[in-house]
């Protein structure tokens, strides 16, 4: 059948038999937009979860170190409160007892704190005597270690067990207690490279001339770095006491993650901090500084940036 002009203009065509049929324009199903929107929402949720996991993995070391700093601050505050509750005469007695201990520390007990070799066994009485020194709160906290230029502020504990080295600074048994005095050499150590805390990671940036302190009871003992060296684990020759000298050596493993050698930071006692030294203001304060949790800002900011980028991409895609 021949199609008329009117039929052509109206969009109809003749059927095989009978009257012409009119074309119908197909319209999207009513729920198709909702389906596409639901798919976009699920895609956004999935991508946000992936982004959160990725940011979490990247920022985990910073977050873990911040929470560790809170724990360190709590331990230091508890130690300070215990010391303040002691009478001045009692504090003096504790320090005098520690200095008397230093005058008779057992010889031959120095060992690399990270070596798999078992340490030389101490007599039970000697070990009990050691652990009772400076232990005013019965929690094995000996004092406080601060290295301002490296942002290290940690409690000092008895011994160098794995538990101790993972939570703060350990005092090496067989070395002098960190209470100063001629003919003393204290060895302090902590881990580097563990994922949940910085601890002695920054020690690899130590420089000669840096000033750090130990705080025991109500006394602050100042030390200035005079020598830095890297030695093999079994080389303990520079950890021995030198007559008339008041020294501290800081020890950690190096290189980080390899741990084949030991980084030794040697320092000698000084009477006071030079007025122009950057440590002057920091060491004058007592409050532990845990720092601002920038990792939260980075995490939230990263998720927000990803969310906005996804919305912009999805909008262009729909168009």
Model-derived features with residue positions:
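C-terminal single-pass membrane-anchor helix
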Residues: 282-319
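Solvent-exposed, non-transmembrane regions of membrane-associated and secreted proteins
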Residues: 32-290
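Terminal targeting segments of Actinobacterial cell-envelope proteins
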Residues: 1-40, 278-283, 313-319
């Amino acid at each position: 059948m021949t199609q008329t002009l009117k039929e052509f203009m109206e969009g109809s065509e003749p059927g095989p038999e009978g009257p012409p049929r009119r074309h119908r324009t197909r319209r999207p199903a009513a729920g198709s937009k909702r389906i596409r929107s639901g798919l976009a929402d699920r895609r956004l949720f999935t991508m946000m979860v992936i982004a959160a996991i990725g940011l979490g993995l990247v920022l985990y070391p910073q977050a873990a170190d911040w929470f560790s700093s809170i724990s360190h601050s709590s331990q230091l505050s508890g130690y300070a409160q215990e010391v303040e509750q002691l009478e001045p005469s009692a504090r003096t007695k504790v320090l005098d007892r520690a200095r008397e201990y230093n005058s008779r520390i057992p010889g031959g007990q120095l060992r690399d704190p990270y070596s798999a070799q078992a340490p030389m066994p101490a007599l039970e009485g000697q070990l009990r005597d050691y652990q009772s020194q400076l232990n005013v709160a019965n929690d094995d906290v000996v004092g406080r270690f601060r290295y301002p230029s490296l942002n290290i502020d940690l409690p000092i504990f008895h011994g160098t067990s794995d538990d101790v080295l993972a939570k703060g600074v350990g005092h090496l048994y067989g070395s002098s207690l960190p209470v100063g005095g001629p003919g003393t050499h204290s060895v302090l150590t902590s881990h580097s490279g563990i994922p949940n805390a910085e601890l002695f990671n920054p020690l690899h940036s130590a420089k000669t001339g840096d000033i750090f302190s130990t705080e025991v009871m109500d006394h602050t003992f100042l030390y200035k770095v005079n020598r830095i060296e890297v030695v093999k684990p079994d080389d303990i020759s520079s950890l021995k006491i030198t007559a008339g000298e008041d020294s501290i050596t800081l020890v950690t493993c190096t290189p980080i993650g390899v741990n084949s050698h030991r980084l030794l930071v040697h320092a000698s006692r000084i009477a006071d901090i030079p007025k122009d030294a950057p440590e002057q203001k920091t060491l004058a304060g007592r409050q532990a500084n845990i720092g601002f949790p920038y990792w939260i800002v980075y995490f939230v900011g990263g998720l927000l940036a990803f969310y906005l980028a996804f919305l912009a991409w999805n909008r262009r895609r729909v168009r």
